[in-house]
């Protein structure tokens, strides 16, 4: 009975979201130069390698994925084209990194989130501004925006100079669990993608934003390989479920009470 329900959900969602395919560009398009002022790039200090994306949420904090952690990193803000520098680009280093350690009612799938306090505040500018945290959870069926400098081919890796942007659909979590049975029955992650395939986040997009209704609703977490397969959406850490933790740390309370 459960399998029938999941298959029915997949069919209904595939048919309903097919109607929205005209809103999407296969594989994503180059982001508009003014639409990603909050998008940051994480680099390894020693190798200079691009690691992950992240999101500026205020002048002093960046939100990204915990699996993007490396001992020595720097954060680049205001970048569009890796080979063309803007006058207002800024570089910062982590002053402190915070990881979500709560265990009550949270599985390992729910904890891929890292809050970075920058070594000094960022100045808002033409190409730098924070993105709002969510005021409410996103609704299934929402069309959301993803972006990043991650690979644009899979399984072989091709990294672009300019970030790519695409629209994907927020799906019911049961869709992801139907495709990936090892997922827990309940999760505080978001399931999102395009069931027809061809559009997806991929390697090195990790840590970047899932934006729904102009708010940061998700952090790029995990997806199948190769990327962008039909009927195989990806998982995003649900920011709304970590909101109290984030806001408490920003307010100076680093011994945060875990949410229920």
UniProtKB/Swiss-Prot annotation:
Annotated glycan sites: 105, 156, 172, 253
Gene Ontology molecular functions: serine-type endopeptidase activity; toxin activity
Compartments reported by the entry: Secreted
Entry's Gene Ontology cellular component terms: extracellular region; secretory granule
Active site residues according to the UniProt entry: 67, 112, 206
InterPro entries hit by this protein: Peptidase_S1_PA (IPR009003), Peptidase_S1_PA_chymotrypsin (IPR043504), Peptidase_S1A (IPR001314), Trypsin_dom (IPR001254), TRYPSIN_HIS (IPR018114)
Any GO BP: proteolysis
Tissue and organ expression note: Expressed by the venom gland.
Known EC number: 3.4.21.-
Superkingdom, taxonomy of origin: Eukaryota
Record domain Peptidase S1: where: 25-251
Record-stated family: Belongs to the peptidase S1 family. Snake venom subfamily.
Name of this chain's protein: Thrombin-like enzyme 1
Organism: Trimeresurus albolabris (White-lipped pit viper)
Source lineage: Eukaryota, Metazoa, Chordata, Craniata, Vertebrata
């Amino acid at each position: 009975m459960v399998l029938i329900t999941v298959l029915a959900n997949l069919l209904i969602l595939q048919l309903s979201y097919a109607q929205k395919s005209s809103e999407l560009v296969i594989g994503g398009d180059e982001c508009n130069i003014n639409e990603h002022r909050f998008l940051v790039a994480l680099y390894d200090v020693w190798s200079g390698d691009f690691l992950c994306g992240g999101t500026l949420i205020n002048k002093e904090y960046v939100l990204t994925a915990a699996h993007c952690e490396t001992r020595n990193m720097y954060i680049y803000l205001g970048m569009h084209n890796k080979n063309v520098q803007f006058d207002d680009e800024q570089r910062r280093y982590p002053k402190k990194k915070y990881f979500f350690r709560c265990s009550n009612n949270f599985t390992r799938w729910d904890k891929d989130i890292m809050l970075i306090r920058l070594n000094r505040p960022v100045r808002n500018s033409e190409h730098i501004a924070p993105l709002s945290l969510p005021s409410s959870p996103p609704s299934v069926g929402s069309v959301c925006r993803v972006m990043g400098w991650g690979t644009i081919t899979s399984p072989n890796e091709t990294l672009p100079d300019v970030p790519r942007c695409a629209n994907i659909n927020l799906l019911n979590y049961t869709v992801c669990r139907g495709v990936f049975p090892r997922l827990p029955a309940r999760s505080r992650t978001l399931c999102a993608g395009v069931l027809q395939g061809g559009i997806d986040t991929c390697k090195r997009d990790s840590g970047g934003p899932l934006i729904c209704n102009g708010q940061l609703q998700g952090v790029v977490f995990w997806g199948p390989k190769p990327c962008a397969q039909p009927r195989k959406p990806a998982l995003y850490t649900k920011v709304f479920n970590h909101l109290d933790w984030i806001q408490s740390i920003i307010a100076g309370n680093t011994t945060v009470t875990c949410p229920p």
